[in-house]
Amino acid sequence: MKQPEKNVLEVKNLSVSFHSTAGEVQAVRDVSFSLKKGEVLAIVGESGCGKSVLCKSIMKLLPRSAQIKSGKILLNGTDITDYKEKEMQKIRGSAFSMIFQDPMTSLNPTIKIGQQIAEAILVHHPKKSREEVYNLSLIHI
C-alpha cells in the first residue's frame, strides 16, 4: 500500500493583524490550506483583501507593524511560525521563495531568469560552482 504524500506546506488557522494609531486591523483571518509536492495553489481576491499579507506571513517578511496573531505555518512538517530571521534566511530561497507582485523589483529584466535563479542557489550552496548551479537552474533543480 502506497504511503500518502506528506504536505510540503501547510497553513493552519492563520490570522494576521496590523497595529496602528487607530487600533488593530485584522488583515488575514483564520486561513488554512495545504500543498503536496507538485500541487499549485492560486490565491485570488480583490485588491487589499490580504493575499500579499498571507504570502509575506508565510515567508516571514511582514513589516514590524504586523503580527501573526494565531495559527501555524508548517514547512515539510516543521513548524516555522516562530522562526527568527536568522533561521528564515537559511530556508528562504532554498526550501521556498516568493516572486513579488511587482516584477520590476523582483526580477531584473536585463539578466536572464536562469542567472537570477542561479544567484539565489549560490547564496545557499556556496561550494557549488557558478556554472554547475546555472546548469541546474535550467533544468529546474
Q: Where do the protein language model's features map onto the residues?
A:
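A short, flexible loop at the N-terminus of ABC-type nucleotide-binding domains that lies
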Residues: K2-V8, S17-D30, K37, L61-Q67, ...
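ABC ATPase nucleotide-binding domain
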Residues: E10, S32-S34, L74
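The feature captures the beta-strand-to-loop junction immediately N-terminal to the Walker
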Residues: V44-E46
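Conserved catalytic motifs of ABC-family nucleotide-binding domains
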Residues: C49, A66, M98, P103-Q115
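Conserved small/polar residues in nucleotide/adenosyl-binding loops
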Residues: C49, I139-I141
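Short helical segment in ABC ATPase nucleotide-binding domains corresponding to the A-loop/adjacent helical element
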Residues: M59, L74, M104, T110-V123, ...
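Conserved ABC transporter NBD signature motif
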Residues: Q67-D79
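ABC ATPase NBD coupling module
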Residues: I80-S97, V123, R130
